[in-house]
Amino acid sequence: MKILVIQGPNLNMLGHRDPRLYGMVTLDQIHEIMQTFVKQGNLDVELEFFQTNFEGEIIDKIQESVGSDYEGIIINPGAFSHTSIAIADAIMLAGKPVIEVHLTNIQAREEFRKNSYTGAACGGVIMGFGPLGYNMALMAMVNILAEMKAFQEAQKNNPNNPNNPINNQK
């Protein structure tokens, strides 16, 4: 399964940006940790990473995923979480599971950070666990996609399903 990981504004500055809040781990190190998690778990997962500081590029990337071989999206929209209805709309149009990740617990921060338009559009939000949150999102995504595939397989094999090829034989 192929999963797109989208990183928003200022995440390229991890390791330098307010280490008291975000720690010393860089974005590249977070991506390496995710790749290691995939390898150690022997998961059949291909990760693609994308980082931008521009709202429109995040929207473009989500839209590009529509009809592609990406099965899910893990996104940290950064501060756009609190301001971007446009990214939230793109998430709702993605047609695939989307999980939002935040390194910090946005509910424990400034009042203006407590609302997440993008989080409301996602299937779930993981926050406050630092870099571990990305592996938590990855684990959740793998399980969600496995459940979806199992459900689709069960539907396909259901003799009462009008789309079952057995029911179309004459």
Swiss-Prot record:
One of its GO terms (biological process) is aromatic amino acid family biosynthetic process. The active site is at residues 22, 102. It comes from the Bacteria. GO terms for molecular function: 3-dehydroquinate dehydratase activity. Substrate binds at residues 76, 82, 89, 103-104, 113. Pathway: Metabolic intermediate biosynthesis; chorismate biosynthesis; chorismate from D-erythrose 4-phosphate and phosphoenolpyruvate: step 3/7. InterPro entries: DHquinase_II, DHquinase_II_CS, DHquinase_II_sf. The record marks 17 as: Transition state stabilizer. It catalyses: 3-dehydroquinate = 3-dehydroshikimate + H2O. Keywords: Amino-acid biosynthesis, Aromatic amino acid biosynthesis, Lyase. Its EC number is 4.2.1.10. Homododecamer. HAMAP family: AroQ (MF_00169). Belongs to the type-II 3-dehydroquinase family. This is 3-dehydroquinate dehydratase. It comes from Helicobacter pylori (strain J99 / ATCC 700824). The lineage of its organism: Bacteria, Pseudomonadati, Campylobacterota, Epsilonproteobacteria, Campylobacterales. The gene is aroQ.
